[in-house]
């Protein structure tokens, strides 16, 4: 099941007044998968050897720790190659914090315990539990440091671009393989393909990447008071 499908399954349950608890794990996994897709690229830097790879990795980590904003376009296709969903959005990153915006969703994590999103379409404000397990998966620094969790192989190197395949060493991952393409000399990727266990493929193209040194942790705090007309759904 693709990221967008999981989100919309949860939204449909809310809209139809169904019990949303069974859908919670799907949505949480989807959000973590999306952040992983956006950030997995720098892990491929260790497919190279020597001080150059170390320097690039440290530069990528510092870039995210200091603040960065990424614009992306994504498309999800099924096993038959049919497009299920396409969208554009923005993700802002500052150390452990992120703010992800796409379609009618505004998803926030403050790096500590506040994990929430606002659904503009249904006018819902949803709160999740930012426990240690979720923090570990969503923390960009920890993700950048987890290169040993993937088996990496170089697929191609041409026209100033390197393409790598990353497969998880641990079983049970929602993604069977990442295919990551990035320009030489750049820490963050330009294209990421995530192939799910079910065979769905989500292709993310990074259309813009800029430093965002003025980001503050307060920018990632989302409260119900910002949406006075919204229904608050507390799943903590």
Where are these regions (language model features)?
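N-terminal secretory signal peptides that target proteins for export/translocation
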Residues: 1-24
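Gram-negative bacterial Sec-dependent N-terminal signal peptides
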Residues: 2, 24-43
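N-terminal leader/targeting segments and the immediate start of mature chains
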Residues: 36-38, 42-83, 94-97, 225-236
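Non-transmembrane domains of secretory- and envelope-associated proteins
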Residues: 49-50, 158, 169-176, 184-236
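Short beta-strand segments that buttress and anchor functional surface loops
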Residues: 72-74, 99-103, 163-171, 191-195
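An acidic-aromatic
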Residues: 85-137, 197, 202
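A short, surface-exposed beta-strand/turn
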Residues: 93-94, 108-110, 178-191
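Flexible, surface-exposed loop/linker segments and immediately adjacent secondary-structure boundaries
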Residues: 129-160
